[in-house]
Swiss-Prot record:
It catalyses: tRNA(Ser) + L-serine + ATP = L-seryl-tRNA(Ser) + AMP + diphosphate + H(+); tRNA(Sec) + L-serine + ATP = L-seryl-tRNA(Sec) + AMP + diphosphate + H(+). It comes from the Bacteria. SUPFAM superfamilies: Class II aaRS and biotin synthetases, tRNA-binding arm. The lineage of its organism: Bacteria, Bacillati, Cyanobacteriota, Cyanophyceae, Gloeobacterales. This is Serine--tRNA ligase.
Length: 429
């Protein structure tokens, strides 16, 4: 959620920055400015009426103490004015409450403001390539898609998952389940070695948690909801881990906080009809290891760089070719002020595909979740900055290993980093 001060100080500049995301936010911002102005005017009028009422009470008391009769015309006039002011106060209070509620409902619909260094662009075609790592493998045969490799080797079965649930689910079997479990353990071990504290959070969260991290109200259609209990299946571990500190004031000594968490993730993929209908790239249920950070505002750019490096480390250890891109304003996520995507090479598609998205939200989520800290050198409290990123999406890493490590005979070599977990060199039928 944006700082209301941005609306008051320079609404024209705010409109200009948000409009670089695509669309036109002019009308919404003008509505918010008007509501905020009306609410503050109502508050001022309330304060004045309240002060006048208090003064009238004192005047009546003074007259009565001096022996003025209760029925004196001046006393009666003052009392009537007091009665009128009470009615006015009630009216102004209701008016202010309504304006505040309308403002509070509209403000969360605005996305975060892109940082100044974010490249301006319309869509993914305008994203900026930052760097490449590794060399895509060259095969002397036509590389198979990961879903074909996986089913031939008995690692995965989509038909049985569809029988149990519906399309866009998978059942991992035998060495497929082993490889998935190995990847999860490997990723968590790497991040723990880098100082992250592991969390195993709830997989169901309440509406306040979904709102706190920005999934609601915008992404309600893409989420699975248990309506009878007002709970939501988590779309990412970012939601429960960030909300562990909701409505809390942290001490400066507690920061920075670095967490890693493995969870299943659940997404309806409402807007993805016809895209990635086969394989592990886009499922309703998938596994992910998430990295979540909380820090002081001045430290978030550096923490962002470290976050990206920690996600890259997993790909480098697995020796998977990838590239890093910076998202332009038009491709930036709703709550992100800046974002870097890691894209892994998939030989069957002859292109890089997203495997991690590392975002700096600055104070956007913290304002929604009321997550603050007390700095010893400043009065009052400040909102922390939050950051998160995949470290990594497990299913997509699984797919990348199958495709990049495949052999002509249909077997798949196990990356050196995973051999202590899988305890074999090759995956075969």
């Amino acid at each position: 959620m944006l700082d209301p001060k941005l609306l008051r100080d320079d609404p024209a500049k705010l409109i200009e920055r948000l409009n670089t995301r695509g669309g036109d936010f002019t009308e919404v911002i003008e509505q918010l400015v008007a509501l905020d102005s009306q609410r503050r005017a109502s508050q001022t009028a309330f304060n004045r009426a309240q002060a006048e009422g208090n003064q009238i009470g004192k005047q009546v008391g003074e007259r009565l103490r001096r022996g003025t009769a209760v029925g004196d015309p001046e006393v009666l006039a003052l009392k009537q004015r007091g009665i009128d002011l009470k009615a006015t106060l009630a009216l102004l209070q209701d008016q202010e409450r309504e304006l505040a509620e309308r403002f509070a409902a509209l403000l969360p619909t605005l996305p975060n403001v892109p940082r100044p260094e974010v490249p301006i662009g319309k869509d993914e075609n305008d994203n900026r390539e930052m760097r490449f790592w590794g060399t895509p493998p060259i095969f002397d045969f036509e590389p198979a898609a990961h879903w074909d490799l996986g089913e031939r080797l008995g690692l995965m079965n989509f038909a049985r998952a569809t029988l149990v649930a519906q399309a866009r689910f998978v059942t991992l079997m035998g060495d497929g389940a082993l490889l998935e479990r190995a990847l999860i353990a490997f990723m968590l071990d790497r991040h723990r070695a880098h100082g992250y504290i592991e969390i195993l959070p709830p997989y169901l969260v309440n509406t306040a948690s979904m709102t706190g991290t920005g999934q609601l109200p915008k992404f309600a259609e893409d989420s699975f909801r248990c309506r009878d209990d007002d709970l939501w299946l988590i779309p990412t571990a970012e939601v429960p881990v960030t909300n562990l500190y909701r409505d809390e004031i942290l001490t400066d000594m507690q920061l920075p906080i670095h967490h890693c968490a493995f969870t299943p993730c659940f997404r309806r993929e409402a807007g993805s009809y016809g895209r990635d209908t086969r394989g592990l790239i886009r499922l309703h249920q998938f596994h992910k290891v998430e990295l979540v950070k909380f820090c002081r505002p001045e430290h978030s750019p550096t923490e962002h760089e470290k976050l990206v490096a920690d996600a890259e480390d997993v790909l480098q250890q697995l020796e998977l070719p990838y590239r890093v891109i910076e998202l332009c304003t038009g491709d930036l996520g709703f709550g992100a002020a800046r974002c870097f995507d890691l894209e892994v090479w998939l030989p069957s598609q002859n292109r890089y595909r997203e495997i991690s998205s590392c975002s700096n939200f600055e104070d956007f989520q913290a304002r929604r979740a009321n997550l603050r800290f007390k700095a010893p050198d400043k009065k009052g409290t400040e909102f922390v900055h939050t950051l998160n990123g995949s470290g990594l999406a497990v299913g997509r890493t699984f797919a990348a290993i199958l495709e990049n490590y495949q052999n002509r005979d249909g077997t798949v070599r196990v990356p050196e980093a995973l051999k202590p977990y899988v305890r074999r060199d090759v995956l075969s039928r």
